[in-house]
């Protein structure tokens, strides 16, 4: 196997879809036992009161949209998946729908997550937003 230069690797990554890149990152993290997440600083303070913990949970600003089931109208779901996930070809969308449950959108705004969920549920799909 020939060694690829950094520029060649970047060119390969540019050709990949977001889903393919996401799968690559997951495999990379598993293989080398690392994480691509940015380190988070945690300030040590007193334990929050019960009311404060509830408020923190309500302040979530990024959501993941997960396709749980395609339902009976798989073709309609594939069309909506292609619309929602940018840069996705027909084959990739079909593979994604066939391999449920799958993450469709990661860390999107609440409006985008709710809009995607509504469009998918209108076609008969089962969707969860986390």
From Swiss-Prot:
Highest taxon of the lineage: Bacteria
GO CC terms, sorted: cytosolic large ribosomal subunit
Gene3D superfamilies linked to this entry: 3.30.1390.10, Single helix bin
Keyword Ribosomal protein: yes
Name of the featured protein: Large ribosomal subunit protein bL12
Family to which this protein belongs: Belongs to the bacterial ribosomal protein bL12 family.
Keywords on record: Ribonucleoprotein, Ribosomal protein
Function of the protein: Forms part of the ribosomal stalk which helps the ribosome interact with GTP-bound translation factors. Is thus essential for accurate translation.
Matches recorded under InterPro entries: Ribosomal_bL12, Ribosomal_bL12_C, Ribosomal_bL12_C/ClpS-like, Ribosomal_bL12_oligo, Ribosomal_bL12_oligo_N_sf
GO biological process, one term: translation
Species assigned in the record: Mycobacterium leprae (strain TN)
Assembly and oligomerization: Homodimer. Part of the ribosomal stalk of the 50S ribosomal subunit. Forms a multimeric L10(L12)X complex, where L10 forms an elongated spine to which 2 to 4 L12 dimers bind in a sequential fashion. Binds GTP-bound translation factors.
